């Protein structure tokens, strides 16, 4: 009788003599002690089990277990959920998009999310204070049923249809006042969580002055309150940071677009830098701050400067901040004028278009405490400030092995693999400023990637669906700096004439 390969390979090949048919719903485990005639056990696959119904009722666009294993972050539709070890989901934020796969990573302090058009960050914290059902009319929240926890003032409010940056500002029992206007006529499940901090503060220009705070402030947190523009965030701690600049003497011989560097003081990566925005007869009359510095000892006023041009004699009077997480001065991204009032610092932030050199990204990873991400449909990629979700404007570079665009990024063995359309290259952290990374000589490869989300870690390396100038859809594993083919002809045959740019891969351990 015929001999069927019930245990063994499973694929369809062009030739029936090479065709192993299909094995459905089993995976094999070989007893390593039985050698050539080893015993093989077949285990049924478990299939899919529904664990968590998410209220957004939309596609799950991405998931990641946060470092430490306490929480999983999942994006469903336009909402960001944090799921605890008991599989209880809590909405903690809202994206500006609702479809398409997202990239998620974290550094143990912040979760970083990219959706192709925007970038977001969530300060890792206990996400839930209360879960309840309620309706909203204008700024009035009416609670119809408390499911778990306790509702209180100074809690951020989340749920389908609730505007971002909404805070419960007053009320008790079943009637509460919220900071944003909404209309939810039918009772829906909502959840609240304590804000990161309640502030007594004022804003003048891009300086936030905090006179009282209930919690710790960090770069990347959203600031909300009466009159505060949506999307206002802390971009830098005030301590050692230049908040404002006055020209003391304008010097001579300067030209528009000259680069100016403040001399003196003790600083970290870089001193404060400027670009000349206006001159009058060679005398500087206007400056644009390009980097606010990070001083441990600030320069003495009037501060001397150097330039890339031919000008001399420009001196500046610098005002630096005092904020280190508590009261003091902080740098924000929006210029406002608001007298002292109650404001709130929130843990979830949609990063503004002014963050970094470009907006958006569709893949992100973490290396040496830098978030690294791409600029979609270009060769560019960027790195955030260390241990921060904020990106300095000049902290970016371009893949340049070939003219093809950068498609995907993965960090492996402390290095950054830039996978393009048909070529790839590897960069490493060398600690330079403003961009910490440099390309490793000899790391270029004539293999790119066919699908940006086909990258998956496997063993001590990673695999992906490759592409080069001769074709695509080989599955390869990175071996050092160069990919090695691991797919069989039969596997590749299944990908022939298929659209694979939207392929997604994942690995698991039995």
Question: For the regions a protein language model found, what residue spans apply to each?
Answer:
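N-terminal beta-propeller domains
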Residues: 1-90, 356-426, 432, 503-509
